[in-house]
Structures are given as C-alpha cells and as structure tokens.
C-alpha cells in the first residue's frame, strides 16, 4: 500500500482532478494504514517579456514578485489541504521553484514518496509538441509508480 503520496498541483481545476481519486483511494485505508499526502506547488521561473515598439527583452521576476507568487501558491495549497483534512487525511504542503518535472521528481525523492498522483491535461498531437507534457516527463523519468488522472470531460481551468 502507498504510505506517502505526492500530488503536484498547478492551481487549475484540471490539475485538481487527481485529488478526488486520491481521496477515494486513501479513505479506504485510513485509519488502518497511515497515509501522508504531500501537495506540491512548483513555481516555474519563466521570464516576463517586455515589448517596446518592435523590440522585446526578457526580464526576470523581482524578489518581491517571487515572494508574492510563493505566498499565493502556499495559500492555495493550504486551503486545499484544509478541505482534505476534514476527511481525516494527513496532508502536508510544499512549494519549490524550477523546472516543473524536475522539481516533482526531486520532491518525490525528498519525501520518499511511494506514488506520484497527478492530473493530465490530455493534450495530444501538435499541442503536446508545442507545450510539452510535464506528466509525460515525470512518467518516463520516475523510479516510483505514477498515477495519471485525466480530468472529467468539460472541466474548465479557471
């Protein structure tokens, strides 16, 4: 049985699709088996692009911007964790920054996870090539099982 589950979240409704599956899976085991769920938020350090006329230049986030983003991600994870704790689940939260797939794999190692449960946006064809797939990268690089959950049809990101 899985005792430490990592659930990466991106703040979207599609990204939350794995939560209900994990809640159902874990609720059948608690309290017989102690299961710890870690909700992970990854801040990708994408640059802003400033456009002036026909010229553009990449601009890094300021420390204040990163601090604000980190706080918003932490608030979201804590709010999500609180709603799950009402079901008697043990929930932790964690925020990192960097390449999303790399950070997910690193966090799984750090917490000694038995399972990574994540949602897939269901992109295919040219959209997958253009946008890449964090889920694919995690699935093919992980040393532990990865549960991929596709969001229900019609789920809209907010």
Predicted regions and their residues:
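Redox- and metal-dependent alpha/beta enzyme cores, enriched for Fe-S-associated oxidoreductases
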Residues: 31, 42-45, 68-73, 82
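Small/aliphatic-rich secondary-structure junction motif
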Residues: 1-59, 154
């Amino acid at each position: 049985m899985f005792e430490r589950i990592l659930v990466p979240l991106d703040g979207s409704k599609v990204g939350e699709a794995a939560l209900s599956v994990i809640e159902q899976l874990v609720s059948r085991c608690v309290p017989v088996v102690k299961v710890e769920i870690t909700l992970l938020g990854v801040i990708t350090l994408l640059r802003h692009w400033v456009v002036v006329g026909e010229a553009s230049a990449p601009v890094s986030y300021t420390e204040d911007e990163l601090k604000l983003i980190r706080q918003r991600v932490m608030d979201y994870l804590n709010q999500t964790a609180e709603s799950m704790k009402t079901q008697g689940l043990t929930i932790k939260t964690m925020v990192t920054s960097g390449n999303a797939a790399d950070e997910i794999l690193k966090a799984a190692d750090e917490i000694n996870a038995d399972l990574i449960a994540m949602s897939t946006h269901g992109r295919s064809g040219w959209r997958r090539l253009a946008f890449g797939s964090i889920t694919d990268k995690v699935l093919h690089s992980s040393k532990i099982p990865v549960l991929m959950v596709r969001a229900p049809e019609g789920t809209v990101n907010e």
